């Protein structure tokens, strides 16, 4: 097996590391899997521990998607393998082997993957999230909007079928992981950014 193929399991294992749990334990915060929305992600950590903890979680989760792709770029891997490596990191965050395959929703890790594909694509997705969040104050709605548009951004900027397909699958999984949020949005029960979830 060519050594570059080992980047797929490496990306998955790195994705399986929970930044939210590590940050929360380090800072003495409640376990985000047990408190708040019970999602080990930056938004829940923001509610439980404030901006500093949330930023550290966001950077950690995004790095899980970005680092394997930076390594892959340095090895000049093929486009299909490059796409698979990014997708593996994302799946690792959603279904982590270290936490009984119960992970987060993948927003920050998906951002890291998109930045790894091409930084302008990641920037466009981030600006979409920020714009929707500024207008509506819903983290989940912002994530859904960015997820829906991400494959379009990849297609327009990169034109790579492999990367478009990988991004499309990431987007579908991300939307699926937000099904509870979608139900609450439709019922008018979703917590806005800055609100404490009890």
From Swiss-Prot:
<keyword id="KW-0443">Lipid metabolism</keyword>
<feature type="transmembrane region" description="Helical">
    <location>
        <begin position="113"/>
        <end position="133"/>
    </location>
</feature>
<keyword id="KW-0444">Lipid biosynthesis</keyword>
<keyword id="KW-0812">Transmembrane</keyword>
<comment type="subunit">
    <text>Probably interacts with PlsX.</text>
</comment>
<comment type="function">
    <text>Catalyzes the transfer of an acyl group from acyl-phosphate (acyl-PO(4)) to glycerol-3-phosphate (G3P) to form lysophosphatidic acid (LPA). This enzyme utilizes acyl-phosphate as fatty acyl donor, but not acyl-CoA or acyl-ACP.</text>
</comment>
<keyword id="KW-0594">Phospholipid biosynthesis</keyword>
<dbReference type="GO" id="GO:0008654">
    <property type="term" value="P:phospholipid biosynthetic process"/>
</dbReference>
<dbReference type="GO" id="GO:0005886">
    <property type="term" value="C:plasma membrane"/>
</dbReference>
<keyword id="KW-0472">Membrane</keyword>
<comment type="pathway">
    <text>Lipid metabolism; phospholipid metabolism.</text>
</comment>
<feature type="transmembrane region" description="Helical">
    <location>
        <begin position="153"/>
        <end position="175"/>
    </location>
</feature>
<comment type="similarity">
    <text>Belongs to the PlsY family.</text>
</comment>
<keyword id="KW-1003">Cell membrane</keyword>
<feature type="transmembrane region" description="Helical">
    <location>
        <begin position="3"/>
        <end position="23"/>
    </location>
</feature>
<dbReference type="Pfam" id="PF02660">
    <property type="entry name" value="G3P_acyltransf"/>
</dbReference>
<feature type="transmembrane region" description="Helical">
    <location>
        <begin position="81"/>
        <end position="101"/>
    </location>
</feature>
<keyword id="KW-0997">Cell inner membrane</keyword>
<keyword id="KW-1133">Transmembrane helix</keyword>
<dbReference type="InterPro" id="IPR003811">
    <property type="entry name" value="G3P_acylTferase_PlsY"/>
</dbReference>
<keyword id="KW-1208">Phospholipid metabolism</keyword>
<protein>
    <recommendedName>
        <fullName>Glycerol-3-phosphate acyltransferase</fullName>
        <ecNumber>2.3.1.275</ecNumber>
    </recommendedName>
</protein>
<dbReference type="GO" id="GO:0043772">
    <property type="term" value="F:acyl-phosphate glycerol-3-phosphate acyltransferase activity"/>
</dbReference>
<keyword id="KW-0808">Transferase</keyword>
């Amino acid at each position: 097996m060519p050594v570059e193929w080992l980047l797929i399991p490496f990306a998955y294992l790195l994705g399986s590391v929970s930044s939210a749990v590590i940050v929360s334990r380090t800072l003495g915060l409640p376990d985000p899997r047990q408190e708040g929305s019970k999602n080990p992600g930056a938004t829940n950590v923001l509610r439980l521990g404030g901006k500093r903890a949330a930023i550290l979680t966001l950077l950690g989760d995004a790095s899980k998607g970005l680092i394997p792709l930076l390594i892959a770029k340095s090895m000049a891997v093929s486009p299909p393998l490059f796409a698979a490596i990014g997708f593996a990191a994302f799946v690792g965050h959603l279904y982590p082997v270290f936490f009984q395959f119960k992970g987060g929703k993948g927003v920050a890790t998906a951002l890291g993957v998109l930045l790894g594909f091409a930084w302008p694509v990641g920037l466009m997705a981030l600006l979409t999230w920020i714009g929707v969040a500024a207008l509506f104050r819903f983290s989940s709605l912002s994530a859904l909007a960015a997820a829906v548009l991400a494959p379009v951004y990849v297609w327009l900027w990169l034109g790579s079928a492999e990367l478009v397909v990988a991004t499309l699958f990431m987007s579908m999984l991300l939307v699926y992981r937000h099904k509870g949020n979608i139900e609450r949005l439709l019922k008018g029960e979703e917590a806005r950014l800055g609100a404490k979830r009890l």
